[in-house]
Amino acid sequence: MFVYARSKYCGACKQFEAETFTNSSVIDKLNKDFILISIDVDEQKTETRDFRIRVTPTEIFLDPKGTEIKRLLGYRTNQTFLDEINKIVI
C-alpha cells in the first residue's frame, strides 16, 4: 500500500504531483505494486492523525498487513522516488 499525504497549500506537493506523479515509469511502478491512497490533510483530519502525518508531502509505504515499511518526507525527483520504490519492491 502507498499512502500519499498532501495539502492544497503545499508548494512541494504541487511540484511532486506535476513532475513525479505524471512520470509514466513512476505511475506504472506504483500501479503495479501498490494500492494507492491519497490523503488531503486539510480535509481528512482522522486519517492525518491515524497516519501521524506532520508535514507534506509525506509518502508512506505499508506492507500487506498495514505495517509501515518506509516513510518519506518532502519532494523527490522522478529517479530518486523510483530508487526508493525499488528498495522496497524487488
PLM regions and their residue ranges:
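Short active-site neighborhood of thiol/selenol oxidoreductases, capturing the structured segment around
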Residues: M1-C10
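Hydrophobic beta-strand anchors of alpha/beta hydrolase catalytic cores
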Residues: M1-F2, L36, E59
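Solvent-exposed coil/turn segments that connect beta secondary-structure elements
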Residues: S7-K8, V41-D42, P64-K65
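Typically the conserved alpha-helix immediately C-terminal to a functionally engaged Cys/Sec
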Residues: A12-K29
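Non-catalytic, surface beta->alpha helical segment in thiol-disulfide oxidoreductase systems
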Residues: E19-F21, R54-I90
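Structural microenvironment flanking redox-active thiols in thiol-disulfide oxidoreductases
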Residues: E19-T20, V41-T48
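Structured helix-beta-strand junction loops
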Residues: K32-D33
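Electron-transfer interface patches adjacent to heme c in soluble/periplasmic c-type cytochromes
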Residues: I39, F51-R52
